[in-house]
Amino acid sequence: MHSFAAPDADPTMNLPLTPAVAPEVLTPASAASLPLAWQTLEAVPDPEIPVVSIRELGILRDVRVVTNDRGETAFEIVITPTYSGCPAMQQIAEDIAAAMTRAGLGPWHVKTVLAPAWTTDWISPEAREKLRSYGIAPPTGAHAVSADAPRKITFYGRPKDGVPCPHCGSADTEVVSAFGSTACKAHYRCRTCSEPFDYFKPY
């Protein structure tokens, strides 16, 4: 098993399991293999909402080739949690490990970056449609800021115009609980079709 020490690595910002790769790796990290690494990781699903990928949710921020002081190259996989302390991050790191190993890519390491903080603005339009089809109302509104711009941290508030029901489209909905199946969702009920649903909180 071969490990890779990233240049200027900050151990507090890297998930613990990662600088490792299976011995059967055939494709080293290079500019030529970078597109394959992206393609591999774009298919990794979110463990809590498997209908969307970590790229579509904006969790996967970057994949790049880095070189250490010994001249060795590796893939650096940059991820940002949806919120600090998100319990799914360890599972995401393990799923990334499995995907890279299956694809025969490496060595690699996962780097967790907390700034800029993740925002629901990073969820792609395709992911929003997939969430709706899955029965989860996507976040409404937008912060209208770039990923690198300073952003105020805001807490969840109820949308003024109601959350459209992902089942029937009605905006005549009500909050059942500010806490849904996961910490990033609220639980709603539609008054029109009477169906319950989760709403992905905007922040």
Label each residue range with its predicted role.
Residues 1-203:
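Domain-level signature for proteins that mediate thiol-based redox and metal-cofactor handling
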